[in-house]
Amino acid sequence: MARVKRGVVARRRHKKVLKAAKGYYGARSRVFRVAKQAVIKAGQYAYRDRRVKKRNFRALWITRINAQSRAEGLSYSRLIAGLKKASIALDRRVLADLAIHDKTAFAAIVAKAQEALAA
């Protein structure tokens, strides 16, 4: 049986990993063994942080909504309860956008929520 020389395959694999590690600091971008670990770890961070990003944005939206709704005289939790009671189905991303860019529309929504809570 013929001997298998894997020079081409190994070179291709090494090039792929080193290309993925381009821009990393020091040996992480030059030494295959270290670069391979760095690329794997970067992939783990990317996977985790794609999920964390969703949590962070939701927290940011809630903070923005709370700040603006308190300026209108209603806490965040009361606002959300009022919106549910008034069956206004706006998600937090849209509410946060309105709170920042269209304060009059947001004030109208808060007023609707207050009416629903009073009823």
UniProtKB/Swiss-Prot annotation:
This is Large ribosomal subunit protein bL20. The keyword Ribonucleoprotein applies. Keywords: Ribonucleoprotein, Ribosomal protein, RNA-binding, rRNA-binding. One of its GO terms (biological process) is ribosomal large subunit assembly. Belongs to the bacterial ribosomal protein bL20 family. Signal peptide: none annotated. PROSITE patterns: RIBOSOMAL_L20. Pfam families: Ribosomal_L20. GO terms for cellular component: ribonucleoprotein complex; ribosome. Binds directly to 23S ribosomal RNA and is necessary for the in vitro assembly process of the 50S ribosomal subunit. It is not involved in the protein synthesizing functions of that subunit. It comes from the Bacteria. The gene is rplT. NCBIfam families: rplT_bact. The lineage of its organism: Bacteria, Pseudomonadati, Pseudomonadota, Gammaproteobacteria, Cellvibrionales. It comes from Saccharophagus degradans (strain 2-40 / ATCC 43961 / DSM 17024). One of its GO terms (molecular function) is rRNA binding. The keyword Ribonucleoprotein applies.
